[in-house]
């Protein structure tokens, strides 16, 4: 490409900073980048817009996927991508959307805080129904076009504020969305872990490779329950961590504590899940015998015979093949009873929720410092755990060494006892031989203990010296612990021998 033509094209290309005013109007941040509330410069257009700056330089795969899908998808309940800005100077990417003043995360947070007061304010029933219907309508459109959202959660469900689309639901953040009509490989191979843990379907947690649009339905069921109770139904303390292993023990435990352990008859394919062996090893069915969705919702004052509960049950079926579809859910009797769902989820009433606050760099620094402190605490806990593990290993090794020493001592004592028994047997045999020789000499001796006719005085003295030497040699063979006993025994033997003579 001609250099001059390239430079001319860049100069003519619109720049986001020339068209929009957004400085000091940051309303959101995340791993994706930053979001600003913006309005046009030098224009009669008073409409507010959302400018999403993609983190990093250039286009990431997630950004490319989101741009490609949103340029094709057009539905009242799916966020509208108006324009894409590419800055060739700093290689920044900007996405321009319609601005939504509210989202379900802030709305539910507002009502959860109200529950702590003496006069709790729940999300109005009509508003819950309208929110759910519009979410289902938007997801039905995505599924009809072979798109899985894969990251549905309250923060990604936007609600428009005052304006032409007041109270309209907008499904946002398509960074994890995928086409599923004919993937080149199993979806689990592309992204092993998707969806925030609290809204993750059980088949994902058990390592399903060929998962379907039922994972979005499970997430909608979680959002529905949260709207009814103002509490995350499958709240788990574990943070959302990207990992290649989809199995998550604590999240499964939380699901079973609410739903109960799945029966084989209720989920026939559970044995085919890649992590089924780990599941049976880590969990006992009997621990969740008294758990059920009925009991959980009754604690939150949701009657099990209500149409809302019946629909919730269909959305939160463990078996993805039995889980209701978005189209079937929209035709559920829940939506045909009063109050009927409305296009404006606020039903024309004043909006009680505060507008988004602008974030400052100090907020960012505070959050960064808080994050660093949290990381330091986690590191300290990890170090303490490692030290405890090392101490346990050292204690175990010391215990093994002590046991080995005790075993060696027992073996030595056993060997000493055997040697003592053998020596005693030898001594008894020698004593018997000495008694026999003494008796023979008595028969051969004359009066007053003198040698008899068969032995002269010299032979007698030689024989006596030999016997004394033999007794001394036997005494030396005994161990130190038995020396005194052996010497007493020899003295007794010698004393008896002298008495005979």
Curated annotation (Swiss-Prot):
EC number: 2.7.11.22, 2.7.11.23
GO annotations of cellular component type: nucleus
Cofactor(s), names only, from the UniProt record: Mg(2+)
Ranges of Low complexity composition bias in the record: 373-431, 446-501
Coiled-coil region: none
Record-annotated Protein kinase domain positions: 21-335
Binding site for ATP: 27-35, 52
Record carries keyword Nucleotide-binding: yes
Reaction(s) this enzyme catalyzes, per UniProt: L-seryl-[protein] + ATP = O-phospho-L-seryl-[protein] + ADP + H(+); L-threonyl-[protein] + ATP = O-phospho-L-threonyl-[protein] + ADP + H(+); [DNA-directed RNA polymerase] + ATP = phospho-[DNA-directed RNA polymerase] + ADP + H(+)
GO biological process, one term: G1/S transition of mitotic cell cycle
Disordered: region residues: 333-501
Oligomer and partners: Component of the Cdk8 module of the Mediator complex.
Protein role: Component of the Mediator complex, a coactivator involved in regulated gene transcription of nearly all RNA polymerase II-dependent genes. Mediator functions as a bridge to convey information from gene-specific regulatory proteins to the basal RNA polymerase II transcription machinery. Mediator is recruited to promoters by direct interactions with regulatory proteins and serves as a scaffold for the assembly of a functional pre-initiation complex with RNA polymerase II and the general transcription factors.
Name of this chain's protein: Cyclin-dependent kinase 8
Organism: Aedes aegypti
Lineage: Eukaryota, Metazoa, Ecdysozoa, Arthropoda, Hexapoda
